[in-house]
UniProtKB/Swiss-Prot annotation:
Residues that hold Zn(2+) according to the record: C16, C19, C72, C75
The keyword Zinc is assigned to this record: yes
Full protein name: Protein yippee-like At3g11230
UniProt record similarity statement: Belongs to the yippee family.
Domain Yippee positions: 12-109
GO MF, one example: metal ion binding
Organism: Arabidopsis thaliana
Length: 129
């Protein structure tokens, strides 16, 4: 395996709860109104220090999307997913953006969203936007 290069973020950021690797800046939050199977999730315009899994079509609360799960590049922990393609016209704004599950990341003030509220049947991507 080659040398691992990490992007260091300047400013308030969200990081992996397992290894504290920077994942996204607070300034890159698009929406805090998303829901995942474990509870709250935030939509970000830019996420760093992650690698993507296999593309798959997934039916979510807002319709069919092509997504990839994303993992921390340092420790390999699942942290959320990235939207590759939205089938519905009104969901196109999500393309290229990533969702981080709050219970999988540390917040900018060092807190973690520990409450895992189970949501029925698969992934959710409800938002108020």
């Amino acid at each position: 395996m080659g040398r691992l290069f990490l992007v260091n973020l300047e400013g308030k950021s969200y990081s992996c709860k397992h290894c504290k690797t920077n994942l996204a800046l607070c300034d890159d939050v698009v929406s805090k109104s998303f829901q995942s199977r474990h509870g709250k999730a935030y939509l970000f315009s830019k996420v760093v220090n992650v690698y993507a899994g296999k593309k798959e079509d997934r039916m979510m609360m807002t319709g069919m999307h092509t997504v990839v799960d994303i993992y921390c590049v340092k420790c390999g922990s699942y942290v959320g997913w990235k939207y590759e393609f939205a089938f519905e016209k009104n969901q196109k704004y999500k393309e290229g953006k990533s969702v981080l599950e709050r219970y999988k990341v540390w917040g900018p003030d060092g807190n973690n969203y520990w409450v895992a509220q189970e949501v029925e049947a698969g992934d959710s991507d409800t938002d108020d936007a």
